[in-house]
Amino acid sequence: GIEIIYNDTFEECYFNDIELPSTLEDIQSLAFGFSHIREVTVKSKEINIGRGAFLQSTLRKIQFPKGYKGVIERDAFEQTELESFDWPDYNDAIENGEIDMSWKDPQFPSFKRCRNLKEVRFPEKQKLIYINSKAFLGCPKLTKLTFPASTKKVVYGDNYYARNYKKSPAELVFLGKDTELKPGSESYYLKDGDDDNKHWIISVGKIVAPRNSKAIQKAKNVWKIKKLTYGQMDELNGEYENEQGSANEFHGGQTDVDSEGISYEKMEYQYLN
């Protein structure tokens, strides 16, 4: 049976529903890029989906078999019409080194500018759920992410939620007390030039978790973006455009609150009832 679908093979082709056989091991970059496709059913539990494999296609739904443990590279589903997504079980892939965790943004699913995406469902008993920077940028209907109580650790990258940018998740909801939460980048700011303390940023509007949970403890000690400058918004992959150029401080790590007028505020948190 077929094992590989090579780069650009079905680019700009027309399909309705596709079933990918259990023999398939690899869908390479842009294999279905820009295609007119409705639904994909994956039979293999270990198929790898390459970067931009379904980029800017009309994909509405993709179904994985129970226990799917393949690797989905970044931007595989960028600008598709997906409405929901079941996050794979990555425990084995991380333990076996199939995902290089030394990268700044490891290979985990991202959904930039998936404007119809409303829900992402995470599996139980995950040792790590890693949300890359810009993974949910430009997803206005995805208002929150909910993590099961059995989740051990969540790393949340820069997704730019602010009072003047609400096209990424507004809330992170933790159902358990023992889930650890960490910022997913080196982004921080200094209150003034002589401040030696790093003020870590998690770019979300609010953290919801049980009282005395690890997530609430983290929420009490991190900051969030209050308002982005035009320069920052210019970097949001076309979500905003202007003539002032792009500000790179937020990506660079050391972010002086005064340098580009970016403003921050303490993280809002709420106890889960």
Predicted feature locations:
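Short, aromatic/basic amphipathic alpha-helical patches
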Residues: S185-G193, N197-K198, A215-K226
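Surface-exposed intrinsically disordered loops and tails
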Residues: G97-K104, L190-H199, L236-G238, G253-D256, ...
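C-terminal capping region of solenoid repeat domains
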Residues: N221-N273
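A structural signal for leucine-rich repeat
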Residues: F77, F111, N159-N164, E186-L190
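Leucine-rich repeat
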Residues: P109-F111, N197-K198
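Structural signature of tandem-repeat unit edges
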Residues: G1-I4, C13-D26, S35-N48, S57-V71, ...
